[in-house]
């Protein structure tokens, strides 16, 4: 997952994405190709724990939320509100520090950040690790909905029943 997303360097082989040779050198390269990663370790790799929910959601799309290098607060608020509502992120408000959310809601913030980039391919690396049963079901439902919308989902999990239950192909 980290190689596909451009975090780690590939040692050998060839990757093809959308019919073209694909060699990401950074996550930015992956995002430009429409590939997003919901990482295994959300606290170390997916979130900035000391920032509010809203800032985490738009972190990957700040360039799209600015005009002449000035952030457009109205646009940012619309995006954040859309994903907080759509993903049912339980937070008192978008200024709540993400470190104070439950594991399931933190995972939804990571997902919101990737959805805001409008990626066509989403890599879910251990998407339900460390979250409660209710949040797991919500994540599963979101993954199915994304697949129905035409998004390609790559799921990595150490739980075989989870893979069997969620996958078209293994």
Language model feature labels by segment:
Residues 1-170:
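Glycine-rich phosphate-binding loops of nucleotide-dependent enzymes
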